[in-house]
Amino acid sequence: MALDRAGRICVLAAAWALTASAAQAQTFELKLSHFIPPNHTFHKWALAWTEELTKESGGRLKFQIYPNGQLVGPPNRQLDAARNGITDIAFVLHGVTPGRYPTAELVNLAFSWPKAGSGSSITSKRMSELAPTYLAKEHEGLHLLFTAAAMPILIYSSVPIRKLDDFKGVKIRYSGVQNRNLLDALGAVPLLIQPPEAQDAIAKGIIQGATFPHEASLSLDLATVAKHATEPGLSTAPFAFAMNPAKYNSLPADLKAMIDKSTGPAAAEKFGKLWEAEEKRARDELIKQGVQIHTLSDADVAEIKRRAAPQIEAAIAAVDKAGKPGRKFFEEYTK
């Protein structure tokens, strides 16, 4: 009887070893979807990230990247596609689904960034540090890899905006509820246009301007239709880099550990530094392409901040009223 028991233990041990060995040998191919062109900073970062993971895993992790919405369509479908398993991983800005991620969209409020600065390395790292505590619930159904914030967004326009009064009546593409409210306060006419459609919308006269950093404006080829850019950046735009939870949980422990190690706040900071470098390069390149940079006066900036102040308070209060930790998140993010 003892031998029988020992035999069963040996059989079970052998079966476990074979299962573990099979998992070690199995290849996992993941689909990564995003909405932006291949010349955008995120796509370049994603290529390097996936290549590094493929190498580190000895070829057990492989990736197929789908830019420009090739896999799931418009930007506003990206995160739901990751939830539903149409794609395994997605990257998109929260503002393409206004009001759906209200806590994250507080990052979109005017001149609201950490005291350490508005650079993407700072904002992205800070947002990612806070995400597990404050943002996980409103991203239910997703495994957040990191969150990020773009460089401060400017107004790219076909008409010059040199001063505050020039905003009046100008139709401007916006991203996110908070940007819409700010443009309203400036007298502009905000219109919701998905990022890949901005250039065509300006060319057709549907809008006269759009809110983007220099880097995104270059990747979207806006200089062909918008020869004016207004600085300084008035706000920023939050993004999510997220994975389907079932797909994540289906991976062996060592592969999950590789993904964990290569994402999170440190990865967000690294991505942000790349974004910062590309922003400077893009600004220089756009000037070469004939874009004129207009700088608002200190008095105009002060007036914008004055108009934005009640909106900031109202936005935070609305998130709190909905039972979400708006004020706590905002205070932690901006301190």
Where are these regions (language model features)?
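Absolute protein N-terminus
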Residues: M1, A25-Q26
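Bacterial N-terminal signal peptides that target proteins for export
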Residues: M1-V11
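Intrinsic disorder/low-complexity segments
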Residues: G7, W16-L18
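Cleavable N-terminal signal peptides
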Residues: L12-A13, A23
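Sec/Tat signal peptide C-region and signal peptidase I cleavage site
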Residues: L18-A25
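N-terminal secretory/targeting leader peptides
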Residues: Q26-S120, T133-K335
